[in-house]
Amino acid sequence: MRGWFARFRSRFREPRAGLVVTASTELAPGHYVLPDPSDGALRIVGDDLVLDGQGVLLDGGGRGGVGIVLVGCRRVVLRNLTVRGYAWALVAIDCEELLVEDCDFSHNGRSDGTFLDITRVDEGAGGGVKLVRSTASRIVRLQATGQDIGVDLVSCRGIVVADCDLSHNAAWGIRLHGSTDCRLERNRAHHVNRCGGAGCDAAGILLTWGSHRNRVAGNDLRWSGDGFFLGNQFSPPSNDNLVVGNDGSYSPNNAFEATFSRGNVFRRNRACWSNYGFWLGFSTDTVLEENLIADNRIDGVHWEHGARGILRANLIARNGRDGVAFTLDPTNRDFPDRCVSTGHELCGNRFVANSRAAVFLLHTTATRLVGNRYETERTPVLLAGDTRENDIQDVFRTT
């Protein structure tokens, strides 16, 4: 018996506050209340190791701090860990090739009732995983709910976040702040909201501050402040992202928003039952193709002060005002170099029963409509203001 107990003790390590992990370790099962002494309740120091916490709950007791901290580590695996009651469950800085899998990092730092500042790198009270200046890492099958942020990627590159449940948070399911070439795939980030459901810039997924060339695919973003939010008004633009096969419906604001940006592509998404399906203010060279944009309270697509947009093969139906609205406010001189609404192309779209008009052009020029189909539309195309030099080739046979 003494020999068996000795072998058990040698295999498992009992967590304690301030524990430094330097080699592969299995933590002894149990519920451990471990306050953060200042630099993490547990710290990982070293490369090429595995921390396995099957049956372990690390509990910060709601006193803030960080559950697990890694700085400058490479090829570390964290699996089967449950961490709650801290500001952040896991913070990794300047790390490479991390793998976080099958962990529960829920019920950490949370705030509510205040409008979020999407440009602040330290916005939010905390959450599940925060990676800073880290690369080539994977976060898979993570549960991180009931807090401000599920996964926060700051100045990262090549991160994969897949098959995670990041729902019912109060700020963002996933935030990318200055992070590029990442893949966000098949995650659940629904019901991410605050301010009593008004949103206050909460979103299922947020991209900001120069987050380029990311792939956002197959995520459930319903019932969030915005489903998908790419916002950059007073920060570097976030360009050339591919957003495909996501559902951002039932937002109190916008199912999908992409502003002050260039070259983003939205393909085969669902944008329904929100205030707006797509809000694309001050963006250029944006592509919408094969999306379902229906039953929104105001416009299916609202695009102010934009240029060179392409809308191709979308179904745009039963929106409360216009199917697509291209607009310009000549009195808005906040961004004088963007005081245009011009050069858009709509081709092969199907418009059905939008309340005021299928397409509304206000102070819009050099825009082309060709091969679109109009069904039970009261007004296929409505022109207003200084709208001129447009190429409208559609034959308006409404059925």
Predicted regions: what they are:
Residues 16, 22, 45-48, 53, ...:
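Parallel beta-helix/beta-solenoid
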Residues 9-14, 36-42, 63-69, 85-89, ...:
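Extracellular beta-strand/beta-solenoid scaffold signature
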Residues 1-9, 140, 145, 162:
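Terminal non-domain segments
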Residues 1-17, 22-37, 42-44, 48-86, ...:
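Right-handed parallel beta-helix/beta-spiral solenoid domain characteristic of secreted/periplasmic
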Residues 2-6, 10-12, 339, 347-353, ...:
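Acidic, glycine- and Ser/Thr-rich low-complexity intrinsically disordered tracts
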Residues 108-113, 192-193, 225:
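Proline-centered turn/helix-capping motifs that create local helix->coil transitions or kinks
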